[in-house]
Regions:
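Short, flexible hinge/linker loops that cap or flank conserved catalytic cores
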Residues: 2-3
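Glycine-rich phosphate-binding loop signature in dinucleotide/nucleotide-binding domains
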Residues: 81-88
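Active-site proximal beta-strand in glycosyltransferases
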Residues: 9, 105-117
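N-terminal strand-loop element at the rim of the active site
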Residues: 6-7, 11-73
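Short, Asp-centered acidic motifs that coordinate Mg2+ and/or phosphate
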Residues: 88-89, 115
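Short His-centered aromatic/hydrophobic patch
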Residues: 92-98
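Hydrophobic packing residues within well-ordered alpha-helices of enzyme cores
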Residues: 52, 101-105
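Short hydrophobic/charged patches on amphipathic alpha-helices used for structural packing
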Residues: 75-79
Length: 117
């Protein structure tokens, strides 16, 4: 399949410190950015943010991996973030971020909601 349209992809994970999920996030970011797509990552930050940005990725700090009652507010922040940035695809890379993304996407109008993987 050939994509002529440039898309905006959001990857969501708890943090960008070290590990397989984090490395995979950077690899996907690098590949998609090299093809001209806009890639965004939402996490609580970490030492790999600099590498992400050097590969043309954009990072936004949001505590999507924190297990507490305030995660409800994170859902609403993510809804606004997705709408504002016109996200086409959301890729959740961990369990808690997946639930946060699931609830956020279900609050968005079905005609405007991104693909969730």
């Amino acid at each position: 399949m050939v994509l002529n349209k440039k898309i905006t992809i959001l990857q969501v994970l708890p943090d960008l410190n070290s590990g397989g999920v984090e490395r995979g996030t950077l690899e996907v970011n690098k590949y998609l950015a090299s093809k001209g797509h806009r890639t965004l990552v939402v996490s609580n930050g970490g030492r790999m943010v600099r590498e992400l940005k050097s590969d043309k990725g954009e990072h936004f700090k949001l505590g999507v991996g924190k297990k507490n009652l305030f995660v409800i507010f994170t859902v609403f922040k993510l809804i606004n973030f997705i709408k504002k940035n016109k996200i086409d695809i959301v890729h959740a890379r961990s369990r808690l971020p997946a639930w946060v993304c699931f609830f956020a996407i279900n609050f968005i109008n079905k005609n405007n909601s991104p693909i969730f993987i």
